[in-house]
Amino acid sequence: PQSLINLAQYGEKYAELPILGAADYKLNYHAATGRAVYSFCMCPGGQVVAAASEEGGIVTNGMSLHARAAENANSALIVSVDARDFGANDVLAGVEFQRYWERKAYELSGEGYKAPAQLVRDFLKDRPSKDFGEINPSYRPGVVLREIKECLPEEVTAALREAIPYFAGKIKGFAHPQAVLTAIETRSSSPVRILRN
């Protein structure tokens, strides 16, 4: 919840001071494999929204309204990938890699455009989630409980499992056991690189 992030960032004395507004954060970590893991597009008092541009794929994104007054804080957790992950040398291999995982998320959902979601505690312990706790997912048209590792590359899953506890050491409550991971954010950067000159 946003209130937990406010408490962690501002401290008990100032957590509810209206003039400060909803707290944000920026986190980064380098996994043992060398992959970068970082928070992206942190939306204080925000929500997770649908952002698919193609049929049969799920893409999530985040946003905050002007007041930043929604009950949840959210951000994308991004893990770096590169041409070695794409499995091909074609100029559009990155686009196909992106589409593949977006389709996997759609298939995993099994319920149309509802996004796969899992509680942080269960993701870290590699077990399915049975129900939601006190944190209400904000994604519309809704979420379904699934093991999100099924729509992520193994290397990405491993890097996230390494980074989330580290982030929790930086921001108390970041890995709240009932926090919700909603999959999949694939559009943080372009899968095609154009070199100039």
Regions from the language model: what does each represent?
Residues 1-197:
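Residues forming the flavin
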